[in-house]
């Protein structure tokens, strides 16, 4: 299983790459220049690949979050008093942290 912080960094990098490629594709260049045409084609292909990867990563995050919600729901139904205790503890910690500000 991959690290959530690493996944986030990868998503940020892919988003930045996507934005950069879109900017390059919008920029002016001599369409008659063969290198420009080749570069534009490669950039469009790379942009499509990046968009697919970002979409897949987004789907993966959604699936993992949904699974975590189901596990938490099952846990609370199996052990309601422990769930209440955890909720109270989290609320207490958040209250203390917010009160310090």
Swiss-Prot record:
Induction: Maximally expressed between 6 and 12 hours of growth, in early stationary phase.
Sample GO molecular function, one term: ribosome binding
Compartment annotation: Cell inner membrane
Keywords on record: Acetylation, Cell inner membrane, Cell membrane, Membrane, Transmembrane, Transmembrane helix
Sites bearing N6-acetyllysine, chain numbering: 35
Transmembrane segments: 80-99
Topology with respect to the bilayer: Single-pass membrane protein
Gene Ontology biological process: cellular response to stress; DNA damage response
GO cellular component, one term: cytosol
Entry-linked InterPro entries: DUF883_C, DUF883_N, YqjD/ElaB
PANTHER family in alphabetical order: INNER MEMBRANE PROTEIN-RELATED, PROTEIN ELAB
Family per record: Belongs to the ElaB/YgaM/YqjD family.
Record text on subunit structure and interactions: Upon overexpression binds to ribosomes.
Name of the protein in its database record: Protein ElaB
Taxonomic classification: Bacteria, Pseudomonadati, Pseudomonadota, Gammaproteobacteria, Enterobacterales
């Amino acid at each position: 299983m991959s690290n959530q912080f690493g996944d986030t960094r990868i998503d940020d990098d892919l988003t930045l790459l996507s934005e950069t490629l879109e900017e390059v594709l919008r920029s002016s260049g001599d369409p008659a220049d063969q290198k420009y045409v080749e570069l534009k084609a490669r950039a469009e292909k790379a942009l499509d690949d990046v968009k697919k990867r970002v979409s897949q990563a987004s789907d993966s995050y959604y699936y993992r979050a949904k699974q975590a919600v189901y596990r938490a729901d099952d846990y609370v139904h199996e052990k309601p008093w422990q769930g209440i205790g955890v909720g109270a503890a989290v609320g207490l910690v958040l209250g203390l942290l917010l009160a310090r500000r």
